[in-house]
Amino acid sequence: MARSWSLLLLPFALALVASVAQAAVVEYTFNVGNLSISQLCQQEMIITAVNGQLPGPTIVATEGDTVVVHMVNESPYNMTIHWHGIFQRGTPWADGPAMVTQCPVRPGGNYTYRFNVTGQEGTLWWHSHFSFLRATVYGALIIKPRGGAKAYPFPVPDEEVVVILGEWWKTNVYDLQQRSLVTGNPAPHADAYTINGKPGDFYNCSAPNQTHKFELKQNKTYMLRIINAALNTPLFFKVANHSFNVVAADACYTKPYKTDVVVISPGQTVDALLVPDAGVAAAVGGRYYMAVIPYNSAVNAADPSFLYSLTNSTAIVEYGGGPATSPPMVPDMPEYNDTATAHRFLSNMTALVPNRVPLAVDTHMFVTVSMGDTFCGPEQTMCMPDDKGTIFASSMNNASFILPNTTSMLEAMYKGSIDGVYTRDFPDTPPIVFDYTADASDDNATLKHTFKSTKVKTLKYNSTVQMVLQNTRLVSKESHPMHLHGFNFFVLAQGFGNYNETTDPAKFNLVDPQERNTVAVPTGGWAVIRFVADNPGVWFMHCHFDAHLEFGLGMVFEVQNGPTQETSLPPPPSDLPQC
């Protein structure tokens, strides 16, 4: 019997050895420095970029590979790189958020990021995690299946196309963020949106070289790897005379989801097969606009033109083989405030196969995600308070997060010396219960006013956490893209209004919920997520609107060590930057 089992297992053992043998070390060098660009009426704009590119270089790896990136900071600013969506199991020092897992790399310095991509495949991305520099310091991170394209659980595309959506300011984004901090006023909206770094045809001073072109061939299947790298804006994405078959989100496969519009919040990714309407694929020389517009989810806020640029960003999808004889077709876009379309897209996707959702929950959290106010701080040397003496702030459970300034939180955890760095008292619930989404709730000064702190929630290794994320109307109701470092989570349910702990659990999808690293909490609503804390370290959870993060919309999970060396924090690398 033992011999027959050995024979049966031999092919599997050989396959495992072959898989391990095929794993590679994928190595890149990122030179971060100044780049001069002429765009939108500006003869010369100096931005911070990687390897002189906007977007930066695409990292391509295969599942199981080790990725090594040598980052050389030739810019005038501090710098870190975050590998958005990478679990960093065993490599928490490579996660990248400044003052959370590392001190930033100073100008003239360098740091080598090393991490493994085992158990992950799909579209992720990388970006700066210091100040507003990720406005131009970003790029795609593609993880291919170990079995190649034939291993895709959907029709194999003939080609794959990276589409990175971004925002563009006609000013230095570092100065923009510093001005926002010292005055206490949120930064103004972007001057333009971009597709692969270019704004398109519809802006003033647009030039032909400022519109990205995708040259396609007839009767070929294309998969778009769509990334929202914008600082502060959810986007509607369409291609005229085409629809999409969504097959993955945040590098997790989904059941095929057919739609004519993709809705994507900052931090999120979507993989979609591009489906031409009848006759399009055969139209030699056919030209179609790819377009994005902002999704304005804010309710009871300022005029949308104050919050967002309302001009479409465009690229051109062109079918070759003949002359372009007509202007590109323009897609019909949703209204800016079309929350119904946004919610339909963001909530209807499900996992491709049933997930192993943990049923027993160890830690329950109910967390309000709020805009509010606070008093001017000593660092805000040009503070401009309102008539009540307060300035804009944001918070989770009324705690407005600030980063430490002496050492990183991960170093403090590793050394066991957290005093003066952070405290272990992030609350599981808000200080009071009230009608979170009612218009009258803005009179509730208890929760609207917040205080700055660096609080973490400590979790036992391998514990299961369920978090209800509840939007509030203290200032305005708005969809917030909440991103968790170090983990994926299951999105069990989403809805509008106040979460009801008695009736809403009946809506939980415990069979095939979508798996994400960034969830867009519905405007004036809630989302329930669940994850297993099996990755020791300190892991940032925050709104992926940088305009909200800088004013405190974040918190940190401290996951304790497990029982073995493999489930405990490793020592820091020798080249870890020092503060």
From Swiss-Prot:
SUPFAM superfamilies: Cupredoxins. Glycans are attached at residues 34, 78, 110, 116, 204, 209, 219, 241, 312, 337, 348, 398, 405, 444, 462, 500. Its EC number is 1.10.3.2. The keyword Oxidoreductase applies. It is an enzyme of class 1 (oxidoreductase). One of its GO terms (molecular function) is copper ion binding. It catalyses: 4 hydroquinone + O2 = 4 benzosemiquinone + 2 H2O. One of its GO terms (biological process) is lignin catabolic process. Cu cation 3 binds at residues 129, 485, 542. It is found in: Secreted, Extracellular space, Apoplast. Belongs to the multicopper oxidase family. PANTHER family: LACCASE-24, MULTI-COPPER OXIDASE. This is Laccase-24. The lineage of its organism: Eukaryota, Viridiplantae, Streptophyta, Embryophyta, Tracheophyta.
